Amino acid sequence: MIKTNGFRVLAMVMTTLWMVTIIPVTVVQAADFRGQGFDLSSYNGTVNWEQVAEADMDFVMIRTGEGRAPDVDTQFAANYDGAVSAGLKVGVYHVCCVRTPKEAVEEAEYCLEILDGRDLDYPVAYDMERKGTFAGGRENTTVIAKAFCDTIADAGYVPMIYSSASFLNENFDWKKLKNCKVWVASYSDTRPKLPVSADLWQYTKKGSLEGANTDKGYCDLVYSYMEATSIKFTKPTLTMKKNTTAQATVKMGPNGCTDRKSFTSSNPKVVAVNKKTGKLTAKKAGKATIMVTTGSGRKAKMKVVVK
């Protein structure tokens, strides 16, 4: 990942003894995160996944490549396979090297080509931090981001935008990017303030993860605020009339988490449900159970009766 200027966080603790050096935020901020992870590229060299598996890590964001073909990250396939074998949740990021939305679509298509249908637990992030990307102004930067993210979403993945706190504050129209998750880089001892909630926070570029450090001895470390620890339907039971629609609503905990949700119906011939939105359509008289599952694996059920 492109390195941005930042100041080193002072507090430092050792977790899992010598395996990981994590540079934590304040006690209040640290207590708020729901996952500890890191990001990887070819700059980290060949990863020792046996060592990484012993560390207290939940997820990893892996670079697919930069720009358009043929600039694939030479370690992508090995890193993906290694992360899966180590039991880590996996997301990816692709580096933006363009200045137009048309080119951004081409980058998204190249990213998808590299992914080649691989399953992901975390989003596909668009790494937007090169100055040329912002040369056309806020509106142009926004349409570049939207073009990439829409293409990723259309392929069934969760889109995300990565950049520094200052760029995220100044260079995007977030009203037009409501479906994009956010990954912020801010090397500070407090969680950065943004116009939108950050789903991932890269809080240091000078952490240490045994088995995955660069030749300079460092590894980017990341907090996740995405994962839900609980989920429930606001209405555990619902009665509908045939040929009507309703919206299934849920509440996830802790407050502020942005985990993804997936809805299914036990009997779609009676009640169909939109997998992503939870919109219900009553088709004929009968009963069905609607299930919602978070990305972290939490589940809840709702009973629906159609009359």
What residue spans do the PLM features occupy?
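Bacterial N-terminal signal peptides that target proteins for export
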Residues: 2-14
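Sec-dependent signal peptide cleavage junction
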Residues: 20-33
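Functionally critical loop-and-helix segments that line ligand-binding/catalytic clefts
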Residues: 31-50, 54, 175-227
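Glycine-rich, charge-decorated loop segments at or immediately adjacent to ligand/cofactor-binding or catalytic sites
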Residues: 103-106, 167-177
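Aromatic-lined carbohydrate-recognition surfaces of secreted/lumenal glycan-active proteins
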Residues: 156-169
